[in-house]
């Protein structure tokens, strides 16, 4: 029997007769032979890989996106690969080059949160390099690249979510509303800050720069920033937090200052992460469909859904006990 015939058997070629296929597979089993799936994938045969590349896997955000993407990738018979960059552009570039060499079916890039021309140029280069080997790049959890309409992206409505949160607080009687968690040159804070500003403008309220507070995106950094903010004589009566993790820090600060939630200060988070289940009073927050972002991202990347450019999924304001 020729090597060509054996290769056709392992590639599941329709020209091979059933009896021949059975003999080859039986011989392979006796010899303990294992098919080189990577080599098959690189030749466009067998199972291919869908790669999910994230900045990190801390918290539920990227984990939920990855789970959604994996559900689609595996249902379509693909292998699913997960890797992280640590928000290092050099690591990101090296990883994308390695993935290109392995000829994946698709790559989903999540959490590359930088903005600006330099990132868009990188994304275009990634997309072109992957397209040359038959793969598609999709940004997930990232807003549209205005200067590069050819870059596909699947995101969620961050601006609208925060805008609705501010409207909710204004309706509850609040006028001094702070935004806590600004991190420069990142898409997520930039989008959420824009929603905050638009919400104030909708209500005819000025944007007070002294109420836009930068802090680390964790409960410890938020607690320190909130202690200073809430100790002011003219302290805000409500805070919109960049994330639920930031909101946890604000809870700690308010309690240490003897402030009641929401009587003295109302608090709104963002994400509806699992950590909010432990907060008392229950946190008002903006629910994000992270799993669905991953699902749609994978479907677009694999050509199961066709979208022209950018897909944006809705967010939902979940009103609980920490706001009026």
PLM regions: where:
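N-terminal helix-turn-helix DNA-binding module of bacterial transcription factors
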Residues: 1-48, 324
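Short acidic/polar active-site loop segments enriched in Thr and Asp
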Residues: 2, 48, 105, 174-176, ...
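Alpha-helical recognition/docking segments in bacterial nutrient-uptake
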Residues: 45-167
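Short helix-capping segments at alpha-helix termini
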Residues: 75-76, 133, 201-207, 232-235, ...
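Flexible loop/turn connectors
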Residues: 151-154, 225-324
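Short acidic capping loops at alpha-helix termini that bridge into adjacent secondary structure
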Residues: 175-176, 207-211, 261-266
């Amino acid at each position: 029997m020729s090597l060509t015939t054996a290769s056709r058997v392992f590639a599941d070629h329709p020209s091979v007769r059933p009896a021949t296929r059975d003999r080859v597979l039986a011989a392979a089993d006796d010899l303990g032979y294992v098919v080189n799936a990577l080599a098959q994938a690189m030749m466009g045969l067998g199972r291919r890989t869908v790669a999910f590349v994230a900045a990190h896997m801390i918290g539920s955000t990227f984990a939920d996106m990855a789970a959604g993407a994996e559900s689609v990738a595996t249902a379509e018979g693909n292998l699913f690969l997960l890797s992280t960059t640590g928000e290092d552009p050099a690591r990101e570039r090296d990883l994308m080059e390695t993935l290109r060499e392995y000829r994946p079916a698709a790559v989903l890039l999540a959490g590359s949160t930088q903005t600006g021309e330099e990132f868009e140029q990188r994304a275009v280069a990634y997309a072109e390099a992957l397209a040359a080997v038959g793969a598609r790049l999709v940004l997930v959890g990232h807003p549209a690249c205005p200067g590069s309409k050819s870059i596909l992206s699947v995101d969620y409505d961050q601006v609208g979510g925060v805008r609705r949160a501010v409207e909710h607080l204004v309706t509850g009687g609040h006028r001094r509303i702070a935004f806590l968690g600004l991190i420069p040159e990142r898409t997520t804070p930039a989008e959420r800050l824009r929603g905050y500003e638009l919400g104030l403008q909708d209500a005819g309220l000025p944007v007070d720069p002294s109420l836009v507070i930068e802090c680390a995106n964790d409960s410890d950094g938020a607690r320190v920033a909130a202690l200073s903010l809430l100790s002011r004589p003219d302290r805000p009566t409500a805070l919109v937090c960049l994330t639920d993790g930031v909101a946890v820090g604000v809870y700690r600060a308010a309690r240490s200052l003897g402030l009641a939630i929401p009587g003295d200060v109302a608090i709104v988070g963002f994400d509806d992460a699992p950590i909010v289940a432990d907060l008392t009073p229950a946190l008002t927050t903006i629910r994000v469909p992270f799993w669905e972002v991953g699902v749609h991202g994978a479907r677009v990347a694999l050509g199961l859904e066709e979208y022209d450019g950018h897909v944006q999924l809705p967010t939902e304001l979940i009103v609980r006990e920490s706001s009026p």
